[in-house]
């Protein structure tokens, strides 16, 4: 399924599964997807934690699993799928994830970005259930790629938007996601490849490394989001710094490239040998992301980076 109006495309499940295995959520960690769509990242998070830990599923989801999205239909689907996955108490909310506590909304303000959505923020809903909330332990997400945000009451809250009257939505999501992390928290975020490679966006990368200890970058195959878009994307993994630095030290970063993305040039799943149509898509797809997970774990096992609960 695709949510193409704002460049929102539901992430292939084998990509989600790879990201969750690399981020390795623990049972005591809070996990947020601020662009949750149908809840894929949250479902795979639940399955990962349940598979690796003795877990009271409902108690875990009451406080640890959080998802927000602007699309009310996506939230309804996410709630249904999370219920099927074994959770009746997931914290799934329809709201504009780009609204911050400093957005200065008035009761009667209207605009294209948040019109019709509740005016509370992610911090509002988190503080209602998490005592002493100071940020999430993990943010894992695939934010909308396309479109620009022009609303001044939103832009003024963002460092990356203070020099212009409009900015691409995914740039704001990047800053917002890091802001929503506690210091030391981990992130896995899917981004258009140009944000990590184009000279035009170098100021975004300069801001990023001051606030985030980048650990790894995974380049996804060009067919990954077909048949919905040819947009090439990467996944950024990192740890929020305790405080922003002016100029980071030389830090080792692992660069990974997926060379088999599990789809053909028309976006159809390429199945690996020994599977049937009864198997889930992320099991059937002929991809190399299991090798990516192994390479990442090998890298982390020899690194002094504090990663995980």
What positions do the PLM features span?
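A conserved structural/catalytic subdomain of Rossmann-like adenosyl-cofactor enzymes
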Residues: 100, 106-109, 113-309
């Amino acid at each position: 399924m695709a949510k193409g109006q704002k460049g929102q495309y539901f992430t292939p499940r084998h990509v989600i599964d790879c990201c969750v295995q690399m981020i390795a959520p623990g049972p005591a960690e809070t996990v947020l997807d601020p662009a949750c769509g149908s809840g894929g990242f949250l479902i795979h998070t639940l399955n990962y934690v349940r598979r690796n830990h003795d877990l009271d599923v409902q108690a875990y989801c009451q406080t640890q699993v959080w998802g927000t999205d602007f699309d009310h239909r996506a939230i309804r689907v996410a709630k249904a799928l999370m219920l099927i996955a074994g959770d009746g108490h997931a914290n799934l909310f329809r709201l504009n994830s780009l609204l911050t506590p400093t957005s200065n909304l008035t009761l009667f303000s209207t605009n294209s970005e948040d019109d019709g959505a509740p005016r509370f923020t992610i911090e509002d809903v988190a503080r209602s259930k998490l005592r002493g909330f100071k940020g999430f332990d993990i943010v894992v997400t695939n934010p909308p790629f396309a479109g620009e945000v022009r609303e001044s009451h939103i832009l003024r809250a963002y460092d990356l938007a203070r020099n212009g009257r409009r900015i691409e939505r995914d740039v704001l999501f990047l800053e917002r996601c890091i802001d929503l992390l506690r210091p030391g928290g981990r992130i896995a975020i899917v981004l258009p490849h140009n944000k990590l490679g184009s000279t035009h966006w170098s100021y975004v990368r300069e801001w990023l490394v001051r606030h985030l200890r980048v650990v790894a970058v995974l380049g996804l195959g060009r067919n990954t989001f077909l048949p919905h878009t040819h947009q090439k994307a990467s996944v950024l993994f990192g740890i929020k710094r305790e405080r922003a630095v002016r100029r980071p030290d030389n830090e080792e970063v692992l660069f990974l490239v997926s060379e088999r993305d599990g789809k053909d040039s028309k976006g159809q799943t390429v199945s690996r040998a020994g599977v049937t149509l009864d198997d889930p898509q992320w099991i059937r797809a002929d991809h190399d992301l299991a090798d990516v997970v192994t390479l990442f774990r090998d890298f982390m096992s020899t690194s002094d980076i504090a990663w995980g609960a």
